Amino acid sequence: MFLSVFDVFKIGVGPSSSHTMGPMSAANRFLELVLSNEWPRPSSNVQVASIKVSLHGSLAHTGIGHGTGRAVILGLMGERPDTVDPDRMDAIIDEVEHSGRITPPGHPGYQFHPKTDLIFDKKVPLPGHANGMSFSAFDKDERLLVKRIYYSVGGGFVVTDTELEQMRADKKKPAAAGERVPFPFASAKQMLDMSERSGLSIAQMKRANEETRMSPEELDAGLDRIWAAMSSCIDRGLKVDGIMPGGLKVRRRARAIHDKLQEEWRSNRINPVLANDWLSVYAMAVNEENAAGGRVVTAPTNGAAGVIPATIRYYQHFHEDWDQEGIHNYLLTAAAVGGIIKHNASISGAEVGCQGEVGSAAAMAAAGLAAVMGATPEQIENAAEIALEHHLGMTCDPIAGLVQVPCIERNALGAVKAVTAASLALKGDGQHFVPLDACIETMRQTGHDMSEKYKETSTGGLAVNVVEC
């Protein structure tokens, strides 16, 4: 099993990887299909005149709060998650709403009225995944020409229904034979076994796998871009205050907290317990930016995007021997763990609840931090397990479908748990009672058994017990 570090960490925009970045990418894919010859045309002069989209399952229930409709419009206008300008998004959407047409580059333009051609269908879920969407293209006489179903499966990943079936079939195959990477581990046990046999660290094995796809220089440059985007997101979040969009009137707090912490900096250096405050404010800064639709990095999702940047910034500020190579090793180790979780369970809140989002992020962060603090592979696996174990059963019940409450503070606590898990693991010898693989399987089973009310539908939990103001 190979999942690139650049599939785990993707630069995009908020507020959600599954409900914003995924639908935008699905719209991109459908545009490419419309221009291709991969669908039967009744005759050579038949042209696409209009497009319609329907959103299903969790996308329908929480799509308005997550900006899913906006993401679809942007994607149909040819905008991509990693390149769209957050400052231009409103203007692009206004243009489509006023004209009733989408005009992506390289296309003739198609009729698309968001109020009638973009449907939030809460009644009929699609069978493959909770985050389903259907794109259809019609000719001028309203005859259906081509239709595709896409699923946003978490972390910005998008697949067709056929690809989803293949992906699930691949999970049932034995791990190694056909994979053209030197270390095709698909489980934590395989990862540890390969590390022991090779004498390499987890980061070194992950690097060797990545370098079958790119040069060492390209890999390092890509890792630098990922951290630069994460770090910039923290910095932006620490400078902005005011009310976040969406109607809940939730106020940004990261800047005010950061200002107070700077005043107390000397005492913070003396009393390491207060490092938790810094961890929290870094994570909150990222997730406040995410909630506002700013530039973020999936880590492994947008809803959990604050945990890993916060712990890397913690590593920079509280460990005098940090260096850029350490950040590279952190990201590679975290991506190795994230890939195992995604392969064997899920990182989607709509599939397994928030244990799959913040829980996975905390496990990845704990593993990365333990690695750069000198942990053995066994201690790294232990750190990831501790962090994930203590997120098991966590629900995804965002109020009003917005990635704000409880999501922003939850990232802060996820970062604190990750650091604690790494510290506990480093105090041991790597031998522990619950294997990471067993914990991941428990998370998968728990998510499967969890009521749909608690899986990003905003129909249970805090979403129905707290009055929206």
Regions found by a protein language model. Name each.
Residues 18-35, 309-321, 366-374:
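Alpha-helical support elements that line or immediately flank enzyme active sites
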Residues 213-353, 461-469:
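Accessory "access/gating" subregions that flank catalytic or transport cores
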Residues 81-267:
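C-terminal regulatory domains involved in ligand/effector binding and gene-expression control
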Residues 49-63, 95-102, 330-343, 385-398, ...:
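Short, mixed-charge aromatic SLiMs
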Residues 322, 333, 339-412, 424-433:
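Hydrophobic alpha-helical bundle architecture
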Residues 13-60, 128, 159:
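Accessory carbohydrate-recognition regions in carbohydrate-active enzymes
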Residues 433-469:
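Extended hydrophobic packing segments that form well-structured cores
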Residues 9-29, 291-311, 354-362:
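Conserved phosphate/anionic-ligand binding catalytic regions in large, soluble enzymes, centered on
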